[in-house]
């Protein structure tokens, strides 16, 4: 786009998608995405979920629900804005608690509690994102196409050559690549 540059990874086999984490969620034990990808011998990765920015640069303290391989790694006890993948490799989006995530057979998920980003497309329908603040910023999005491919998008921002993307930009990109959920 005119205001941003980014990278889109298309994962043809959704069973290869997983949540990678730091070894333990404790203040000061965070890692950058590249180091987490190396830890899991992954060929790519994106930031996901919401975390506390404490007094250190890498805090590793998630705020909401985090699940890996069906196990709850972190739970704030409330309802979170969840993005997850089920054991049958379907992308699931919704506001839910840990019990609901288990009921939906979610294998891996991350969440945000402060609703810092909207769901862009749900069941093939572009969501109304008018009035959602945010402007142009670095952005990360995930989507799934009707045939199951996973779309992982990372847009650079706050740089001279890429000030960032809006939520509307992300919605357009996901739709362009055939996302039915994003």
Predicted regions and their residues:
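A short, polar/proline- and glycine-enriched secondary-structure boundary/capping micro-motif
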Residues: 29-31, 102-108, 161-168
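Structural recognition of the beta-strand scaffold that forms the well-ordered cores
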Residues: 43-47, 84, 92, 143, ...
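Domain-core and long-helix interface of multi-subunit machines
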Residues: 113-117, 121-178
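Solvent-exposed loop/turn segments at secondary-structure junctions
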Residues: 15-16, 50-54, 100, 148, ...
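Zymogen propeptides
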Residues: 1-77, 81-82, 90-92
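Short, solvent-exposed aromatic-acidic interface loops
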Residues: 23-29, 96-102, 155-159
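Active-site-adjacent helix-turn-beta-strand microarchitecture at beta-sheet edges
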Residues: 51-133
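Extracellular/periplasmic catalytic domains that process cell-envelope and extracellular macromolecules
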Residues: 37-39, 76-77, 86, 133-136, ...
């Amino acid at each position: 786009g005119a205001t941003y540059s980014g990278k889109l990874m298309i994962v043809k086999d959704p069973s290869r998608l997983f949540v990678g984490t730091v070894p333990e969620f404790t203040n000061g034990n965070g890692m950058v995405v590249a180091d987490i990808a190396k830890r899991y011998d992954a060929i790519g990765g994106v930031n996901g979920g919401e975390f506390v920015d404490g007094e250190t640069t890498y805090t590793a303290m998630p705020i909401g629900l985090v699940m890996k391989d069906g196990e709850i790694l972190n739970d704030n006890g409330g309802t979170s804005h969840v993005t997850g993948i089920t054991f049958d490799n379907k992308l699931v989006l919704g506001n839910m608690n840990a019990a609901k995530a288990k009921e939906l057979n979610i294998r891996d998920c991350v969440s945000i509690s402060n609703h810092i980003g909207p769901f862009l497309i749900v069941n093939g329908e572009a969501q109304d994102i008018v009035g959602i603040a945010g402007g142009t910023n670095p952005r990360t999005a995930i989507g799934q196409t009707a045939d199951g491919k996973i779309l992982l998008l990372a847009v650079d921002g706050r740089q001279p050559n890429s000030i960032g993307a809006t939520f509307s930009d992300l919605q357009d990109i996901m739709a362009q690549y055939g996302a039915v959920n994003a």
